């Protein structure tokens, strides 16, 4: 143990699984501290009451189990969608976007219970340790963060199970062997990494995909879906108004049937290494395509292009755990301002893994049929294009003449 001020009470991000159950007991022993557990329902699809029973069995008296699905989608996913945020051109940031909310609630519960520390179960190799801790420190710079995987010597499955058995911690039969891969899930996505997925040359086995049906087995008939937006946020599906979490749940169900949202990606982690992940984001893939579709007819060209320039920076900040940073908030303010007229409906076609926008309509549309028609019109004089081209060509002509004068043929 370090010479730091002793910890009296710690709030643990607790799933009820083997790892965090061991961490709970380890915190009690190694720090001689009272442990408060916090379990979040972010739409991961797991029964959460077992976490309560396990925490009670471990002697925990303050147990927080919270349904955060609406807050998660409304306050974290939707702002990300307004930004069209995609990391390294492909990744829809499903794990990254869940961490700020968990960090926020850890801090809030610590304040409410008088805890002087929080703890998480992220390993010392991944991005999540960074995301959790940057979030905590941004909200309370004086709160201590404990990361057991960076402190203890329980560095194998065998040691974890032995520790659990020595301390009377329940170990499910299916947890005694080494899991073939690790899974993280929430309402936005499911990610699978490690073990059988570590060789990027090998195709992922069918058992990896838990959120989506195989595109090859999807219906032979396409399905059409209409999504309505107000100020950049999705508010209805097929004419039915619904809350953010309910809407995303509906899109997840549609995407699952049609095999939408699968991604096999090797990404650059913030901590320096490359990692291979299998991501399933069925509803998110549909929603992102729809949002792009409504922006196509409602955003001014300059605003649209500026957003596309800002998006990679926004996505990088989110991926690296800087959700609560001033620069992310500055970008968000600009992005949100751009969305005031992003209102209307988008019609999409789902078919065997693909999502295609096939229709868009809006009272705020900037699309003018009178101006773009190939037929004869009275609003646009094509002769005007000549002066426009000459002005834009001037610098290119001057460059070309200099090359000719100096004999530069390249």
From Swiss-Prot:
It comes from Maricaulis maris (strain MCS10). It catalyses: L-citrulline + L-aspartate + ATP = 2-(N(omega)-L-arginino)succinate + AMP + diphosphate + H(+). The gene is argG. ATP binds at residues 13-21, 40, 121. Its main location: cytoplasm. It is found in: Cytoplasm. Keywords: Amino-acid biosynthesis, Arginine biosynthesis, ATP-binding, Cytoplasm, Ligase, Nucleotide-binding. This is Argininosuccinate synthase. Belongs to the argininosuccinate synthase family. Type 1 subfamily. Its EC number is 6.3.4.5. Pathway: Amino-acid biosynthesis; L-arginine biosynthesis; L-arginine from L-ornithine and carbamoyl phosphate: step 2/3. CDD domains: ASS.
């Amino acid at each position: 143990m370090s010479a730091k001020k002793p910890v009296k009470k710690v709030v643990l991000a607790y799933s009820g699984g083997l790892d965090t159950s061991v961490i709970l007991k380890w915190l009690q022993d190694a720090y001689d501290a009272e442990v408060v557990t916090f379990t979040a329902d972010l739409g991961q699809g797991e029964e959460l009451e077992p976490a309560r029973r396990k925490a009670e069995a471990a002697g925990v008296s303050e147990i927080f189990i919270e349904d955060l699905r609406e807050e998660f989608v409304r306050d974290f996913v939707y702002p990300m969608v307004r930004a069209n945020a995609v990391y390294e051109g492909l990744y829809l940031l499903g794990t990254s976007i869940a961490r700020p909310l968990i960090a926020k609630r850890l801090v809030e519960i610590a304040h409410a219970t008088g805890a002087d520390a929080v703890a998480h179960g992220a390993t010392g190799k991944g991005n999540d340790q960074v995301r959790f801790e940057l979030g905590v420190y941004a909200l309370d710079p004086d709160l201590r963060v404990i990361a057991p995987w960076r402190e203890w010597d329980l560095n194998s499955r065998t040691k974890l199970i032995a520790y659990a058995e020595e301390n009377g911690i329940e170990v499910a039969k299916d947890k005694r062997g080494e899991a073939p891969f690790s899974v993280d899930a929430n309402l936005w996505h499911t990610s699978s990494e490690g073990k059988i997925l570590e060789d990027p040359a090998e195709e992922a086995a069918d058992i990896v995909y838990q959120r989506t049906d195989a595109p090859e087995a999807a219906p032979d008939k396409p399905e059409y879906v209409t999504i309505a937006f107000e100020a950049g946020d999705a508010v209805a599906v097929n004419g039915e108004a619904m809350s953010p979490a309910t809407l995303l749940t509906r899109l997840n169900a549609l995407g699952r049937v049609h095999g939408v949202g699968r991604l096999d990606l090797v990404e650059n982690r913030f901590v320096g290494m490359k990692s291979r992940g299998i991501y399933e984001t069925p509803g998110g893939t549909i929603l992102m395509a729809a949002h792009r579709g409504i922006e196509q007819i409602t955003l001014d060209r300059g605003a649209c292009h500026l957003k596309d320039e800002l998006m990679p920076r926004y996505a990088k900040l989110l991926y690296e755990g800087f959700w609560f940073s001033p620069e992310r908030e500055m970008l968000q303010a600009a992005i949100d301002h751009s969305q005031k007229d992003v209102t209307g409906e988008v019609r999409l076609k789902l078919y065997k893994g693909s999502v295609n926008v096939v229709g868009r309509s809006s009272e705020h549309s900037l699309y003018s049929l009178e101006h773009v028609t190939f037929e004869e019109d009275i609003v646009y004089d094509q002769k005007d294009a000549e002066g426009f081209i000459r002005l834009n060509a001037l610098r290119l002509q001057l460059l070309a003449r200099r090359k000719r004068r100096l004999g530069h043929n390249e």
